[in-house]
């Protein structure tokens, strides 16, 4: 088995590589076929996914069985001020990878986001819920999903949310750093979603790679909370002496609008390969207990 990992140096790509190199996961045993797979790593410096010819050549030269596309322009506010770039990376980049995969018959695992939804609602959203993004980021990611469907027959579109992990920048590290520096934080308390440990997502992507259970998946931490709730748990588990205060989205203005409610239901996982996603508080606690070891690595 050969896997082409696009975006291997990012938060999720690094977590996938960590599982494979360490030959273990916090969630359980990793299939031998995955551990013994040949992994071709690419990042923004070695593969420009906005260049169709370059993508086609890379895929054709390497002839992977599976392509995992973790590459994206994920700066939500940055997408508002750089809409053309967001479209090139999140939409055309996804299209290019899909076209290349179809040409050689490879499976494509494409990572997407909860921000393809409007935020209207109060119950977890299943994979067939109506999409209606409210930001440039969500719009371009949804276009990417549509291109994947249009141009690749063997696809897994995997939506995740509020991702954090041992590698790279994320909300958990930001809150810890700010908590140490300031001693008092204000965090939005009227947006709900699912904090997701990159370890959990990476583990399930690798499991999907071995199947032909194609389609759209939600893959997020179990349970929902607000960003304020999330921040409070980060401070609690870290032991940092910091006060966390709730504010509204109206009080904390950002260039890009965020969905008020984007909690996802992992229905497809439950009905196909099994849902081993941890409750978000449990996964966060394990992360907080272990993150220093990974930094030292």
Region roles according to the model:
Residues 1-26:
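N-terminal Rossmann NAD(P)H-binding glycine-rich loop of SDR-like oxidoreductase domains
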Residues 204, 211-255, 260, 267, ...:
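Mid/C-terminal beta-alpha module of Rossmann-like enzyme folds, strongest
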Residues 49-89:
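NAD(P)H-binding glycine-rich loop region in Rossmannoid oxidoreductase-like domains
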Residues 280-297:
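Amphipathic terminal alpha-helices
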Residues 88, 92-96, 116-158, 163:
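Catalytic helix-loop patch of NAD(P)-dependent Rossmann-fold dehydrogenases
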Residues 146-193, 199-200:
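NAD(P)-dependent short-chain dehydrogenase/reductase
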